[in-house]
């Protein structure tokens, strides 16, 4: 187990290094520079700006200086606002983290519950309703769901104030982000639950007179949750990427909307920092998921 964790940590660090390398050189390969705008600047001004931000140095030197700063928690400054990027991330990430955490918890809790109900009431009307819901939701991307929710609640019902938290709505963005992973977890739980209920140890437990409650929640559900756990890592990645659009739609000042804005404004240092920051979260989430997966089911051999 210890060797596996060390191996995965090394692989995670290498992955983040490759992402930083690709992001850095991709940003520098873009023909249009960060200081180009509709209002032309003189060569002297451009030269002064490049010298100020160290963009006049060789790319290898720039990358070395950039990574040296990152390792000390310094992502540099925004080329558009001249603010420290660490401060911008520190202000906006808690908003995205709250939104993402609520969406993930909603997806997991309701997905497991609905999937279990569908499995236990297979081929009956609750199962058919849940399957219809899953099929409908999985066919729509999150931004379409967000648009429909806005139209229904805000325009048709006019109850936008009932779902506000401070200056930002929280329920509708959480629903927009959680419905797609919730549908997938529902389908995954149902399949795993049906498979678990058909195993020999379940039949043995029933033959011994074990209470139905214990059979379902202690034996069947516990094993059915293992595939769900493996999905948590990719789900977090999906929620992070989906939040970029959702935060823009609902005008939430989280890290996702900041990322979209910095792309629009060609704020290259902000793009690199945000990409690297989100990559660390996604790689870390997948690493933790794999370790928890191994702990829950020691029979699984991970290379």
Where are these predicted regions, by residue range?
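Short, hydrophobic secondary-structure boundary micro-motifs
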Residues: 36-38, 61, 76-79, 145-147, ...
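N-terminal signal-anchor/signal peptide hydrophobic helix marking the start
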Residues: 6-16
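Generic alpha-helical secondary structure signal
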Residues: 44, 58, 62-66, 70, ...
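An internal, D/E-rich "acidic patch" concept
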Residues: 55-112
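Membrane-interfacial helix-loop-helix junctions in multi-pass membrane proteins
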Residues: 51-60, 75-85, 163, 185, ...
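Hydrophobic alpha-helical transmembrane segments of membrane transport/permease proteins
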Residues: 15-64, 157-172
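Alpha-helical transmembrane segments of integral membrane proteins
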Residues: 2-3, 93-126, 142, 165-303
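Membrane-water interface segments at the C-terminal ends of transmembrane alpha-helices
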Residues: 23-30, 68, 132-161, 178-180
């Amino acid at each position: 187990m210890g060797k596996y964790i060390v191996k995965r940590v090394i692989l995670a660090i290498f992955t983040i290094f490759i992402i930083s390398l690709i992001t850095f050189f991709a940003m520098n390969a873009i023909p249009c520079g960060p200081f180009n705008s509709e209002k032309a600047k003189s060569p002297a001004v451009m030269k002064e700006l490049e010298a100020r931000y160290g963009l006049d140095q060789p790319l290898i030197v720039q990358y070395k200086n950039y990574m040296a700063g990152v390792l000390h928690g310094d992502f540099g400054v925004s080329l558009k606002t001249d603010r420290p990027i660490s401060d911008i991330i520190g202000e906006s990430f808690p908003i995205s983290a709250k939104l993402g955490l609520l969406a993930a918890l909603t997806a997991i809790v309701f997905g497991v519950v609905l999937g279990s109900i569908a499995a236990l009431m297979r081929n009956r009307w609750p199962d058919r309703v849940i399957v219809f819901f899953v099929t409908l939701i999985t066919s729509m991307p999150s931004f379409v769901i967000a648009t429909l929710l806005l139209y229904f609640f805000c325009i048709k019902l006019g109850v936008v104030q009932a779902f506000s938290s401070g200056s930002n709505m929280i329920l509708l963005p959480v629903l927009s982000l959680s419905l797609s992973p919730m549908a997938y977890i529902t389908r995954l739980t149902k399949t795993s639950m049906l498979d678990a209920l058909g195993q020999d140890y379940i039949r043995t437990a029933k033959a011994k007179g074990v209470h139905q409650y214990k059979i379902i929640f202690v034996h069947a559900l516990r094993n059915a949750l293992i595939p769900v756990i493996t999905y948590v890592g990719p789900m977090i990645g999906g929620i992070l990427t989906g939040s970029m659009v959702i935060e823009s739609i609902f005008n939430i000042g989280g890290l996702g909307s900041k990322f979209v804005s910095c792309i629009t404004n060609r704020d290259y240092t902000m793009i690199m920092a945000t990409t690297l920051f989100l990559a660390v979260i996604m790689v870390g989430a997948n690493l933790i998921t794999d370790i928890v997966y191994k702990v829950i089911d020691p029979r699984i051999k991970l290379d």
